[in-house]
Amino acid sequence: MNKLIVVIISIILMVGIVKVNGQTKINNRPIIGILTQPTDGDMTTFGSQYIAASYVKYIESAGARVVPILYDIDIKSLTELMGSINGVFFPGGGVDFNNQTVYTDTIQSIWSQVVEFNNNGDYFPLWGTCMGFQELALLSADNFNLLSSYNSENYTVPLNFTSLAAGSRLFSLASSSIMQSLASEPITMNNHQFGLSPQTYQQTSSINTFFDVLSTNVDRDGNTFISTIEAKNYPIYGTQWHPEKPIFEWWDQEVMNHSFDSIMANQYTSNFFVNECRKSLHSFSDPSVEASTLIYNYTPQYSESTVPDFEQIYYFN
């Protein structure tokens, strides 16, 4: 990457505001796109793609609105939508990257547009949780075959922070009590079979030159996986853990910490990401088009009997 571009982006990230004609601009009406994914099994009865409602609540709880991004959206519509929203969220899930080329084509297009926006001084954040975290790493490497297997489903642990965490954008604004909770209490919920190993990170220059590692964890078998990342020069962030689950999911077969400390710490991540999206000045030119795209046009279904992992699910066709 051109060194001048890197310097400019770094300054924007550090300052944390956008100036237009010398005036500081903050967008207090952010709209964030959440990517859908294909349904399978019993879920196909209700629609061909879905978003777990907990991700929507997670974004809304921090003061943003949500637009679903259909994973099979055409490139023209995606480009128009990306120019109107203020950030994108890649949720967790179970997509087989090697057998879902439409899905992977879409996340690659989103990634390319996010990088291009920011290279041009157009601040645009991207967040990935669980599978979304994995997607960020794989997209930076342009290789979907870098993940390792882990014994870390239904597994709630504290974070092992690296030396970079305290000075990172993601965690530098967190209170000492939140950092202490994250580091010492079992409040970060993991639910993944695959992950990014430190060895793969170290051996893959396209990943280790793009992302800093802010935390790691060890699975039940003693194998270390990377659990939090932050792009060095872009507003791109990822957690292998699920900050939305302790706040909004209640299945008693999943080990989730619903304590006050857990809620405060996990909610911090949403507050941080939405605040990043306030720095994006994209907007819809037509209010009626904006209204027609919002998640409010859809009704979530109570899903206890079909998919107990989620309290509610939004389905799409």
UniProtKB/Swiss-Prot annotation:
GO BP of this protein:
tetrahydrofolylpolyglutamate metabolic process
Q: Indicate where this protein resides in the cell.
A: Secreted, Extracellular space
Report which reactions are catalysed by this protein: (6S)-5,6,7,8-tetrahydrofolyl-(gamma-L-Glu)(n) + (n-1) H2O = (6S)-5,6,7,8-tetrahydrofolate + (n-1) L-glutamate
What does the record give under GO molecular function?
A: gamma-glutamyl-peptidase activity; omega peptidase activity
Which branch of life, at top level?
Eukaryota
Q: What is its main location?
A: secreted
Active site located where? C130, H242
Which EC number(s) does UniProt give? 3.4.19.9
The entry annotates sugar attachment on N99, N154, N160, N257
Alphabetically list the UniProt keywords: Glycoprotein, Hydrolase, Secreted, Signal
By sequence similarity, the record places it as follows: Belongs to the peptidase C26 family.
What is the protein named?
A: Gamma-glutamyl hydrolase A
Organism encoding this protein: Dictyostelium discoideum (Social amoeba)
